[in-house]
């Protein structure tokens, strides 16, 4: 993701996702926001060993934590001071050897859930609406189907602030021509050519 070519689907209400297609088959990406800080979110993608992703070491649901900062992205300092873009490995290993990478995607060895109390857990860098640094949303019953699709259940356990944040987070992100996310307000960006709502926009 973060390429600007396809807008992710926001998960903010309880939902059962069935037969989510692989990214290589133009499948959807889902996004779950920190309700207290819209630039922090989790992305869900179905990554399968097929097409232009045939060389992957694993297949399944990839959960990525993003703590977006325009300054960090522009300076290429995304993961220097802290992790702003990281895969939440199903085996809870940050090692990059092949055996460890093979355990990155869900489900893996019985781990088919992601939430406040799972390992790894859905933690945050910025406070949520309740003051905690927990997402308060969970993904359960992650299943990899025989045809390469993924199914899972999403539950929103937040009780405050949801409607207000949804209005903000529904704004489409803006990207530069290198696929770097620049923010949400075109008026605040310098002159140039951007990708917005899937189209090139000149400011």
Positions of the model-derived regions?
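Extended catalytic-interface subdomain
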Residues: 1-3
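Non-catalytic C-terminal accessory/binding modules of secreted extracellular proteins
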Residues: 9-159
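C-terminal outer-membrane/trafficking sorting elements
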Residues: 159-203
């Amino acid at each position: 993701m973060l390429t600007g070519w396809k807008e992710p689907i926001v998960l903010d209400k309880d939902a059962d996702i069935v037969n989510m297609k692989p990214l290589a088959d133009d499948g959807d990406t889902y996004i779950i926001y920190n309700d207290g800080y819209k630039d922090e979110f989790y992305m869900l993608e179905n990554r399968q060993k097929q097409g232009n992703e045939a060389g992957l070491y694993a297949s399944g649901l990839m959960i990525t934590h993003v703590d977006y900062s325009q300054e960090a992205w522009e300076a290429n300092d995304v993961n220097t001071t802290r992790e702003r873009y990281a895969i939440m490995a199903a085996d809870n290993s940050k090692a990059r050897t092949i055996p460890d990478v093979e355990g990155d995607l869900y489900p893996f060895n019985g781990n088919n859930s992601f939430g406040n109390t799972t390992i790894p857990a859905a933690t945050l860098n910025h406070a949520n609406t309740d003051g905690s640094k927990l997402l308060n949303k969970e993904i359960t019953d992650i299943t990899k189907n025989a045809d390469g699709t993924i199914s899972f259940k999403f539950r929103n356990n937040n009780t405050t602030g949801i409607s207000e944040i949804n209005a903000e987070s529904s704004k489409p992100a803006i990207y530069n021509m290198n696929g770097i996310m620049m923010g949400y307000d075109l008026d605040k960006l310098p002159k140039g050519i951007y990708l917005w709502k899937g189209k090139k926009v000149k400011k």
